[in-house]
Amino acid sequence: MTDWLDHLLILPILLPLAVAAVLIPINERDRTLKGAIGFASTLVVFILSMILMRLAAAGTGSLPGSGVYQLGNWPAPFGIVLVLDRLSALMLCLTSGLALAAQAYSMARWHTAGHHFHSLFQLLVAGLNGAFLTGDLFNLFVFFEMMLAASYGLLLHGSGPLRVKAGLHYIAVNLAASALFLIGVSLIYGAAGTLNMADLATKLAALEPRSRTLVEMGSAILGVAFLVKAGMWPLSFWLPTAYAAATPPVAGVFAVLTKVGIYVIIRLHLLVFGTAAGASSGFGQEWLVTGGMLTIAFGGIGVLASQAMGRLAGYSVLVSSGTLLAAVGLGHDGMLAGALFYLVSSTLTIGAFFLLIELVERGRDAGADVLAVTMEAYGDFDEDEEEEEVGAAIPGTMAVLGLCFCLCALLLAGLPPLSGFIAKFALISGLFDMPAAELATAMSAADWTYVTLLILSGLAAMIAMNRIGIRTFWASIEGTIPRVVVIEITPVVVLLGACIFLSLQAGPAMRYMQATADDLLAPLTHSERVLSAPRAGSQ
């Protein structure tokens, strides 16, 4: 491989991995230096992701090595391959962008709350990028474990009893999920003789019934492991508490962790169990629909019940996951592009909200958190309070924080004209993408239930955000004006600005999502591209 472009695919993994190793021996007193190196690494990864996304959007002919990187020059299915297509490029760009914002936010003060923050952060980025690029299930397990190992340390970063308790629960649940992952992978390999996803997609239909059943059993166990990560009910009891306990930059980047589970479910469902899977086509579809809808309902109830903003954000993650899982499970091809648009919009919004929460709560009265917990446990209090001052001027800091909070509320609720509304509209219009005469007969009860839950979840988010916003910004008891530095508010503004830009550029964005959906709905084309990719030097 003489052309440097051939190695672009591995750099989003190799660069943060190397930087993580370089940062470990640097003394913790030089945190500014470590932060600068880590931020520069994440910035370069983001630029690389943008380049790869642009190449992927132009088509496979413009991709280095046709989008397939063969480690050691061993072809698939025998060797390890990294595969870039529109979906993996999209996830790379989303991950690196969110990581860049979270790392910039941490530079204000949070990276000093513990040891080796930036090394762990780089390992997390490397694990995420590897999970999105790998073409086989075993290396998916490797990158999954790398990502989880880093997330364990990051969740405990900052110490404190709440973080330790939530972190131990998080570790226990994810260790169990990792064990299930390994069992599922072993069953699939024993039955099919391959772990390359493209190769598995071509072999599944030809397997004898007994072997195909073992593959389905292994995939079901594998699915449980990733549904734990995606936060599907009833496997999501750990998520709101863990995410609420994490430090703001960690919680911000954790917004994309649940999307790893969603990504793998999409890959397995549409590539391995797609239209070419024969008798196994659509395997597990009913479970995704049922679990996704129950997750939306559970998340919506949690959003309404939450008085603390951290828990509200955690339950919003569940609503997002349930919306995507049910959309994939319903099996309407027209919904897939809208689901991908929703994935991007909701991840950016929730990431921005997690970063914003600490800034908003920084100026609250010391008893406000106690009051919030008490109200969540025992209900609201009826107090008649007289306002001492009417028409007081709003300080500039609170005005900016309030505006960002309002944007988060509009995006989470899916109200026009922002990207949250466009995403939900695309989902519903994709569901109704059929002749009017067929709507009455073609629409199932599950379809109508999904539309209802989608609308009600937005209503729940709007009610909860209004309630918390009024208590925070219109409270009768005055709190101190929070001291916010530019490096803290800038990442929030940038992420929300990205959502606004996504709203303004909804047309081009939806065209990219539709092209991505078309690729996903052609599994044999993807498999052929991976398996027939030429070895370097043979072209």
UniProtKB/Swiss-Prot annotation:
Its main location: membrane. It comes from the Bacteria. It is a multi-pass membrane protein. The chain crosses the membrane at residues 4-23, 36-58, 78-100, 113-135, 140-162, 175-197, 217-239, 251-273, 283-305, 312-331, 335-357, 400-422, 442-464, 484-506. The keyword Metal-binding does not apply. Keywords: Antiport, Cell membrane, Hydrogen ion transport, Ion transport, Membrane, Potassium, Potassium transport, Transmembrane, Transmembrane helix, Transport. It is found in: Cell membrane. InterPro entries: CPA3_Na-H_Antiporter_D (IPR050586), MnhD1 (IPR004775), ND/Mrp_TM (IPR001750). Signal peptide: none annotated. Disulfide bonds: none annotated. One of its GO terms (cellular component) is plasma membrane. Part of a K(+) efflux system which is required for the adaptation of R.meliloti to alkaline pH as well as for the infection process during symbiotic nodule development. May form a hetero-oligomeric complex that consists of six subunits: PhaAB, PhaC, PhaD, PhaE, PhaF and PhaG. Belongs to the CPA3 antiporters (TC 2.A.63) subunit D family. This is Probable K(+)/H(+) antiporter subunit D.
